[in-house]
Amino acid sequence: MTTELLSDEQIATALQDLPDWTRSGDEISRTVQAESFPAAIALVDRVAEAAERAGHHPDIDIRWRTVTFTLSTHSAGGLTGRDIDLARQIDELAR
């Protein structure tokens, strides 16, 4: 997917298909409640592998069994298709 900045309309449309994600300025985030701390770490590991393959990395905050993923394309100065693509992958991995 492209690294061109998405318009507000494009972001809103994409988020309709990503109901667990919320936008705050130039980033989107999702919090996942895992069954346990080891399950949270396993999820982070799966997301890390997907992020490496995509060459695009989320900010990750781990607090016991609660994991928050935040996406933004810092080099572009906001949200791009790469963020939406990785959000979709994170959703699949978090199921």
Curated annotation (Swiss-Prot):
Q: Give the catalytic activity.
A: (4aS,6R)-4a-hydroxy-L-erythro-5,6,7,8-tetrahydrobiopterin = (6R)-L-erythro-6,7-dihydrobiopterin + H2O
- GO BP terms, alphabetized: tetrahydrobiopterin biosynthetic process
Q: Which InterPro entries does this chain map to? A: PCD_sf, Pterin_deHydtase
A GO MF annotation of the entry reads:
4-alpha-hydroxytetrahydrobiopterin dehydratase activity
What are the UniProt keywords, alphabetically?
Lyase
Matching entries from Pfam families are given as:
Pterin_4a
The cross-references to CDD domains, in alphabetical order and at most eight, read:
PCD_DCoH
Q: What is its EC number?
A: 4.2.1.96
Tell me if Disulfide bond is a UniProt keyword of this record: no
Q: Which SUPFAM superfamilies match?
A: PCD-like (SSF55248)
PANTHER family associated with the record: PTERIN-4-ALPHA-CARBINOLAMINE DEHYDRATASE
Q: Which family does it belong to?
A: Belongs to the pterin-4-alpha-carbinolamine dehydratase family.
NCBIfam families membership: PRK00823.1-2
Name of the protein described by the UniProt record: Putative pterin-4-alpha-carbinolamine dehydratase
Q: Which species does the entry assign this protein to? A: Nocardia farcinica (strain IFM 10152)
